[in-house]
A protein has these predicted regions:
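Low-complexity, rRNA-contacting terminal tracts
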Residues: 1-19, 26, 34, 86-132
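Ribosome large-subunit tunnel/peptidyl-transferase-proximal elements
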Residues: 1-72
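Short, surface-exposed linear segments at secondary-structure transitions and domain or protein termini
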Residues: 38-43, 80, 116-119
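Mid-chain, well-packed structural core segment of small domains
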Residues: 63-101
C-alpha cells in the first residue's frame, strides 16, 4: 500500500452496500469497517476510494455468501477533487476483494478503476483493464 496524491472525500459510511466488480463470486457486499483510518471521537467511520475495508457478502454464490473479506474501494458516487482541480464521480460504488497483503483474489476486474486506487494498490492496477 502506497500513499496517494489527492485527498479523497470519504463517501461510504459503514453499512453501505457496494458492487463487487471482480470474479470471486460475490456480487453485492456490505461495508463493515474501514481499516487503517485514524478516527475522530463520535464520528461515524467512512471510507473513500483506495481505502482498505472489511466487507461481508450479501449476494453472490453460496460459497461466498455470509463470509467476511478484505476489500479495496475502486469507485464511489460521491464526487472527490483531484490535486489538479478536476472533480471525479463514478456511476456506482464498487470494490475489489483482496487478501491482507493487497493481492487481488480474483483474476478480472470489471469496469474502470480510479487512478487513486491504482496508485495505492499496484496489484489492482496490474489487474485493471481501465484506469480513470
Amino acid at each position: 500500500m502506497r500513499g496517494i496524491s489527492s485527498k479523497v472525500t470519504r463517501g461510504l459510511p459503514t453499512q453501505s452496500r457496494l458492487q463487487c466488480v471482480d470474479n470471486t463470486g460475490a456480487k453485492v457486499v456490505q461495508l463493515i469497517s474501514v481499516l487503517n483510518t485514524g478516527g475522530t471521537a463520535r464520528r461515524y467511520p467512512a471510507g473513500g476510494v483506495g481505502d482498505l475495508i472489511v466487507v461481508t457478502v450479501k449476494k453472490g454464490t453460496p460459497e461466498t455468501r455470509r463470509q467476511i473479506f478484505h476489500a479495496v474501494i475502486v469507485r464511489q458516487r460521491r464526487p472527490f477533487r483531484r490535486s489538479d482541480g478536476t472533480w471525479v464521480q463514478f456511476e456506482d460504488n464498487a470494490c475489489v476483494i483482496v487478501n491482507e497483503r493487497g493481492e487481488v483474489r480474483g483474476s478480472d476486474i470489471k469496469g474502470p478503476v480510479s487512478r487513486e486506487a491504482a496508485e495505492r494498490w499496484p496489484r489492482i492496477a496490474a489487474t485493471a483493464k481501465q484506469i480513470v
